[in-house]
């Protein structure tokens, strides 16, 4: 297929047009007075959103060269969202400002490679400064403030996120689901829960709630199917003597073995419950090993030389309480040694660091949470489907941003941190051409606060000057149209978000500035439609078919 190639200024102008089109659509959502963007959907109602990355993902331009520019800036937004969970609009605004200023300098004959070097050195200095002014975040109130800001100033969401993080800890898993009701609520699960229920309803001990509740129970963990009762008999006899309940977790329990367990349960000989093992394949083996470590037992597996018929009581795990319903099993207060659990946690953390698959990482984090923290579910409620989707996206954003704040601390929000960090750039002593790159960054750092002010209907230049003349956390509160101490007012940004937005924006903008040629497929020329074949003219006679009605 033929290609079209654009060079130098012609290509950069097309890039700039695409960058501006995407950034202008995204940046109207910035700040507390950010506007909504309505996105048409081919099925169902239009989507109304104030989330920058959602807007960016929907944009596809007709001109291929302009679209290249737009897609590269889209990459800035999605990368920032992946790393920090928020700051997508800020990153887009910064990328547009850096590229726009840099493109002017390149058009005026400056060396793009030197400008890029200047930009990189400036960003390196700024990141170090942002980290030094960062304030660690610890208490419930500060976590709630970060959550509130990231959820577009929705205090309810901020409070729920803070409560969830307090309950499950830093390592815990917090998931977001749609609720059936109007209210947004929080549910937490203590202990280890996995998504497998009892194999027969006859194991239930609480008929009203259809649950099996076993206290001070022994746990038999086996990695194969159990169908032969003979293999189980020795361990059942030992359990009957001990008088403690028994939970059997195995790949499956069927036929004669399951029938015998049910009969013994109904006769009151044994308080017992059988559950299928969670997961599949290698992940199942790992999860059974987790359960064994948590409860202080062993996985009865022929791979390591343990046979089911030779199982002794010291191989069984123990837990203070086990609750099993038809879908889930929850093990509370397992008897595993703290040192063993810590070793297992360390191993899973190492696997999280090494894996390149997002899916594997998510599953490993779930396993980690089940061992050390717990699981919390935020159920998002709303009046309509459209509001539900918008609110759920905000909760997910706020959750990511709050985690980022706990990781690296917080800085004054509303674009103030960038203005305060800017002063460190004055100390840089670089060659003249590189200094132009530093100046590009200086101008770009004003852009987020300028845009926040403009979205609030205020002149951005006046706000920038006034905030620059202030000190420390002094900044502009666009929500109330007043100048305040941003930290005291609870207007804060996670350091990770501010840092990632700047690094990603400068990286892509620098690449675009140093691009000299752009190649795209040549559009197909739409010629005149081919004439109808001559023989089809006789179809005109079909008009007479009307009389057949």
Curated annotation (Swiss-Prot):
One Gene Ontology cellular component: cytoplasm
One GO MF term attached to the UniProt entry: ATP-dependent protein folding chaperone
Matching InterPro entries: Chaperonin_Cpn60_CS, Cpn60/GroEL, Cpn60/GroEL/TCP-1, GroEL-like_apical_dom_sf, GROEL-like_equatorial_sf, TCP-1-like_intermed_sf
Pfam family, one: Cpn60_TCP1
Subcellular location: Cytoplasm
Known catalytic reactions: ATP + H2O + a folded polypeptide = ADP + phosphate + an unfolded polypeptide
The EC number(s) this enzyme carries: 5.6.1.7
Keyword annotations of the record: ATP-binding, Chaperone, Cytoplasm, Isomerase, Nucleotide-binding
Top enzyme category: isomerase
Biological process, per Gene Ontology: protein refolding
Primary localisation category: cytoplasm
Binding-site list for ATP: 29-32, 50, 86-90, 414, 477-479, 493
Function: Together with its co-chaperonin GroES, plays an essential role in assisting protein folding. The GroEL-GroES system forms a nano-cage that allows encapsulation of the non-native substrate proteins and provides a physical environment optimized to promote and accelerate protein folding.
Protein family (similarity comment): Belongs to the chaperonin (HSP60) family.
Subunit structure: Forms a cylinder of 14 subunits composed of two heptameric rings stacked back-to-back. Interacts with the co-chaperonin GroES.
Name of this chain's protein: Chaperonin GroEL
Species name: Geotalea daltonii (strain DSM 22248 / JCM 15807 / FRC-32)
Organismal lineage: Bacteria, Pseudomonadati, Thermodesulfobacteriota, Desulfuromonadia, Geobacterales
